[in-house]
């Protein structure tokens, strides 16, 4: 069956401002720079590689549909939505609230298309029109909690999609697996009390946000036990991530048996990413994707939707993403040109500290019903 693919030209037009992280600041002697760390060119280069590699011929292009207010309000507060409308209407846009998440004038349109792209792909996969798919959306979403924008994220795209699956499509159990290297704090916040969405975050311990993503953060009320954090030590690579998949993630998914799996697909755990200190390669992401796709085939008739999150290496992110796309289509196209350079740098042996960090999570899975 067809594999869906979402890209919109406007995803490459996200205005990240003139600074490298926060806005340029003459007083602090922070120079303007042409490429913010979250500059949209990185995602655009991924899309262009999908086309140049020939993978686009094996995908079904899906037009993004702008998320409605009703879609957004399933994950966010009315106050947050109104604030984003306000910032978007400023003559030159502005800071959405945390000092690093900028929105240009009219940027709300792109944010709606990003969340809406995830929703539209989810709808088509959930209804059987497509077997699976990849939404290469921008801006990302997993840091945005219920009431705010944060960490380059305006709306929480995976949560907006999960909310749609629950409220409109009638799904009773949805899982969100987030392997972006930074803690999925926004997703955790939105579903904290709700067992109808299982949230799993694999991330570098204490990277971003500060003081967030501990294994002890497990949800509350009826949602206790349905939020799983797997904080990994800096320097973790393919071996640690695959051990976490095998010992925690796949067991959690099989215990929960969701009707749909949504993957927050960030590639900032790669060896070449500037915003983390992990050592995953394109082949590591390939193997993680393969395991998750196979798990979906076993437990939810293959219904799986990948939604782009972070990743800040314009050099390597496209090839990490291509590896995941290839696992969806079942067609190999290009080898990883960085493989030989990275192969000897480590990350392929499971270290004791990594094993311990992962295996302390295993007993927590007993609370999933």
Swiss-Prot record:
Highest taxon of source: Bacteria
Listed GO biological process terms: epigenetic regulation of gene expression
Site features described as Polarizes the scissile carbonyl of the substrate, chain residue numbers: 312
The keyword Transmembrane is annotated on this UniProt entry: no
CDD domains registered for this protein in UniProt: HDAC_classII_1
Pfam families, sorted: Hist_deacetyl (PF00850)
Key word Zinc present: yes
Keyword annotations of the record: Hydrolase, Metal-binding, Zinc
Activity modulation comment: Zinc, and cobalt and nickel at a lesser extent, are able to increase the catalytic activity (2.2-, 1.3- and 1.1-fold respectively) at concentrations of 1 mM. Higher concentrations have an inhibitory effect. Magnesium, manganese and calcium have no effect on activity at concentrations between 0 and 10 mM. At 100 mM, the catalytic activity is increased between 1.2- and 2.1-fold. Hydroxamates like TSA and SAHA inhibit the enzyme. Is also inhibited by azobenzenes, stilbenes and arylazopyrazoles.
Entry's EC annotation: 3.5.1.-
Co-factor requirement: Zn(2+)
Activity profile over pH: Optimum pH is 8.0.
Note accompanying the cofactor annotation: Binds 1 zinc ion per subunit.
Gene3D superfamilies, alphabetized: Histone deacetylase domain (3.40.800.20)
GO MF annotation terms: histone deacetylase activity; hydrolase activity; metal ion binding
Active site residues according to the UniProt entry: 143 (proton donor/acceptor)
Residues bound to Zn(2+): 180, 182, 268
Membership in a protein family: Belongs to the histone deacetylase family.
Function: Exhibits significant levels of protein deacetylase activity comparable to those of eukaryotic HDACs in assays both with fluorogenic peptidic substrates and acetate-radiolabeled histones. Accepts proteins with epsilon-acetylated lysine residues and tritiated-acetate-prelabeled chicken histones as substrates. The natural substrate protein is not yet known.
Subunit and interaction comment: Homotetramer; dimer of dimers.
Record protein name field: Histone deacetylase-like amidohydrolase
Organism from which the protein derives: Alcaligenes sp. (strain DSM 11172)
